[in-house]
Structure formats: C-alpha cells, structure tokens
C-alpha cells in the first residue's frame, strides 16, 4: 500500500513538472505567434526592404517614413560595445573573486554585486542622465552628452552582475583535483586559474555572456534616458534610438500603421535575440564537440 501511494505521489509530481514545463513552452509560442500576427501586416504595407533598410523614421509626419535601419545598427553597436566593455571586466572580476580574493574582500564585493543586480533600470538611467551625460559633454567637448557612448557605458555596468555571478559560480564548481594536478606539475596559481580552471568553466562563462547580451539588447528605460532617443544613424557622440526605446517611446500614443510598425519592430527585436542566442549556443556546442 505504501509503495502504491509513493508511486502515485511520484507520478503526480512528474505530472505537475510536465505541466509547468509545457506552460513555459506555451508562453513562448503564444508570444511568438502574437508578434508574428501583429507585426507582419505593417511589413507588408511598408515593404520589407524599406522597413529594414530605410534610414528615415518619421512616424508622425504628414507623409510618414518607417525605416528602422538606424535602430537596428544602434542596437547592434550598443550591445557590442557593452559586451566589449563589460565582459572583460566581469570575467576578470569573477576569476579574482572565485580564486584569488580573501574571504572578507570576496564577501563585500559579492554583496555589492548582488546589490548592483537589484538596482532598478530607471535608477541606472537617472544616475547616468545626471552624472554620466554631463561628464561626457565636458570631457569630450560635445554639444550633448546623451549619446551612444553614454548608453554603452550604462549597459556595460548593467550586465556586470550577471556576468560576474554566473562566471564565478562556474569557476567555483571546477573540481579542486584539476587545480591540484596543475600545481603539482609546477604551474603557478595564476597559470592554473587561466589554463585549467577557466577552460573547465567555459560553458558557464559562455552562458554568462549570453545572459549579458540578452540584458543589453533588451534594455529600454535606462537606455532611453541617456541615449537622447533621436532616430539618427549611430555615431559614438550622437543622440540615437534603440529598437527597444523606439517601441517604448511611441507605443502609448500610436495608432494605425504606426502602431503596427512598432509591433514589427518588436518582432525584429525578438528574432534578433533568438538569432544571437542560437548562434552562441551553436558555437558553444561546436566547441564542446571539438574539445
């Protein structure tokens, strides 16, 4: 009797987990279908080439234009810049915290990183708008500090907690025996960390980079507050608009074709994120198979 009861409970638990997993899949499918249904009509009316490669966005003009190439390039440049700044800093910090830092320093820094992860996006944007934007204007002697550079710096800071925490967890999970064997062969601790521990934790570090990319390309509020939110072609010291901020800034008052075009932008952003994640996962799996 007890065996049957345990089996029933086990089956019930498995059923609950299966349902929860299916709910997650269903949510993704619903979002995908909704974006496709809502975004395709505008692309059909505007024209795929004009929509993706048009350089002019004047959605509220008497004769509106709906070219999103500036938004696409700005999102690519902004994300790439944030990754180039944030990943090296986050990676080196994670190696230090996981392998080199004294316990007291580690505890303080880890708490600070956790606090950084919990700060709302609007606070990042507010601090960036009040401190970073004027600083860029003064240091580089430009008319307006609200620019692509300001957005890159803010995004780089925002992705640091994800990169540091995930990379650190992966490095701490490397078996101690690997490092002991390296040290026994005469390698220094630093050589061991970078030639043994880091390669062993590369899957987790790659996952941290994927999380960082997702956070950077999906951010809207903080970016909108420091980038100027003007639909220009991207330049480092010029006010720009990202894919996310284009949707966030106009959706509240949009209607008709303009509203449909914003859904099309959301669809492009969604596909863009899926493409990046798929590419990074493919490269990671190929690296595993070659290794």
For each of these PLM feature ranges, what is it?
Residues 14, 89-128, 291:
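Cytoplasmic-entry segments and transmembrane alpha-helices of multi-pass inner-membrane transporters
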Residues 166-167, 189-224:
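Transmembrane alpha-helices
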Residues 1-21, 280-291:
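Transmembrane alpha-helical segments of polytopic membrane transport and secretion proteins
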Residues 120, 185-186, 199:
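Glycine/proline-centered hinge or cleavage motifs at structural transition points of membrane proteins
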Residues 168-172, 176, 183, 252-291:
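C-terminal transmembrane helix and the adjacent membrane-cytosol boundary/short C-terminal tail
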Residues 223-270:
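Interhelical loop and adjacent transmembrane-helix boundary motif
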Residues 68-96:
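Transmembrane alpha-helix signature in integral membrane proteins
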Residues 114-156:
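Generic hydrophobic transmembrane alpha-helix motif, especially the helices
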């Amino acid at each position: 009797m007890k065996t049957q009861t345990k089996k029933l409970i086990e089956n019930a638990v498995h059923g609950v987990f299966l349902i929860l997993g299916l709910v997650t899949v269903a949510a993704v499918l619903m979002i995908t279908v909704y974006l496709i249904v809502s975004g395709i009509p505008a692309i059909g009316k505007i024209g795929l080439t004009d929509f993706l490669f048009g350089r002019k966005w004047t959605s509220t003009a008497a004769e509106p234009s709906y070219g999103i190439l500036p938004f696409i390039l700005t999102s690519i440049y902004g994300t790439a810049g944030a990754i180039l700044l944030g990943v090296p800093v986050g990676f080196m910090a994670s190696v230090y915290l996981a392998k080199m830092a004294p316990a007291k320093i580690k505890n303080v820094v880890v708490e600070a990183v956790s606090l950084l992860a919990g700060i709302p996006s609007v606070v990042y944007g507010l601090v960036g708008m009040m401190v970073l934007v004027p600083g860029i204007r003064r240091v580089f002697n430009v008319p307006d500090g609200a620019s692509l550079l300001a957005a890159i710096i803010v995004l780089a800071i925002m992705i640091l907690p994800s990169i540091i925490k995930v990379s650190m967890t992966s490095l701490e999970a490397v078996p101690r025996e690997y490092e002991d064997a390296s040290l026994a062969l005469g390698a220094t601790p630093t050589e061991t960390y970078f030639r043994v521990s880091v390669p062993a934790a590369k899957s987790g570090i790659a996952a941290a980079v994927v999380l960082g990319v997702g956070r950077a390309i999906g951010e809207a509020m903080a970016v909108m507050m420091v980038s100027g939110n003007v639909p220009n072609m991207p330049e480092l010291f010029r006010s720009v608009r990202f894919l996310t901020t284009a949707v966030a800034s106009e959706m509240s008052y949009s209607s008709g074709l303009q509203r449909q075009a914003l859904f099309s932008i959301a669809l492009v952003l969604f596909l863009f994120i899926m493409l990046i994640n798929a590419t990074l996962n493919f490269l990671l799996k190929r690296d595993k198979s070659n290794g």
